């Protein structure tokens, strides 16, 4: 549990910085929501509602056959909104300001992909570069090493330690089978999902 919290600290703290911090706000979504690397890199603004504090996971960015491709995420759970704790809303608002600045500086060279997390010219971020940036962030924070993929387990462990129902953890991490998350139980209302993420957000603020 302590290891999980320590791993979350660098992304949360850096997400609140107002300087030209690139990719670090994406790490907050990876760490807090357990988003997969391809999912956070494929996140689009049209599927983000900051006022309602929720988002949908609609695409993934992956490298296939030597080129970057965007693929649709089609599962039953991907069609449901994922509620955002305040720390994620803050990170996304800061990211929007950063991207607006990038767009203005790029001028006619800006490529409008609709993606939330992009390069300075609007193009998709190379997944391998995302991994390298994440590794540097963790090393600089002097916390136990954790990979981008490993953050999903960290997030799941944190939610379990907060006594969040396994079915809710399944909703948040969008696993297709409850066995992947933990055990079975009964159906849980969507309000429980939002409450679980609020608990996680409160934990990060303490």
Q: Which residues make up each language-model segment?
A:
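Short functional hotspots where side chains directly engage DNA or cofactors
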Residues: 52-58, 147, 158, 170-173, ...
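Structural detector for helix-capping/boundary residues
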Residues: 38, 43-46, 128, 154, ...
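Generic alpha-helical secondary structure signal
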Residues: 4, 8, 56, 129-136, ...
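C-terminal secondary-structure termini that scaffold catalytic or DNA-interacting sites
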Residues: 17, 52, 61-88, 94, ...
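Hydrophobic aliphatic residues
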Residues: 13, 59-61, 138, 173, ...
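Basic, Lys/Arg- and aromatic-enriched nucleic-acid-binding interface segment
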Residues: 1-43, 50-51, 63, 75-79, ...
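Short, basic (Lys/Arg/His-rich) helix/loop patches that form interaction surfaces
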Residues: 11-24, 33, 82, 98-108, ...
């Amino acid at each position: 549990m302590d290891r999980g919290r320590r791993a979350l600290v660098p992304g949360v703290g850096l997400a609140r910085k107002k300087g030209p911090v690139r990719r670090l706000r994406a790490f907050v979504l990876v760490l807090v929501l357990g988003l997969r690397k391809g999912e956070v890199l494929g996140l689009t603004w049209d599927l983000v509602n900051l006022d309602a504090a929720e988002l949908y996971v609609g695409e993934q960015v992956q490298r296939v056959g030597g080129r970057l491709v965007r693929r649709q995420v089609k599962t039953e759970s991907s069609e449901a909104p994922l509620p955002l704790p305040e720390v994620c809303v803050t990170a996304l608002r800061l990211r929007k300001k950063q991207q607006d600045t990038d767009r203005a500086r790029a001028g006619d060279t800006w490529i409008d992909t609709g993606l939330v997390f992009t390069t300075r010219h609007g193009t998709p971020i190379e997944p391998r570069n995302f991994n390298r940036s994440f590794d540097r962030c963790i090393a600089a924070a002097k916390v136990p090493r954790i990979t981008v993929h490993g953050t999903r387990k960290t997030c799941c462990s944190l939610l379990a330690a907060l006594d969040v129902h396994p079915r809710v953890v399944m909703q948040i991490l969008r696993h297709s089978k409850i066995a992947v998350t933990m055990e079975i139980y009964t159906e849980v209302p969507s309000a429980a999902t939002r409450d679980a993420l609020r608990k996680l957000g409160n934990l990060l603020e303490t």
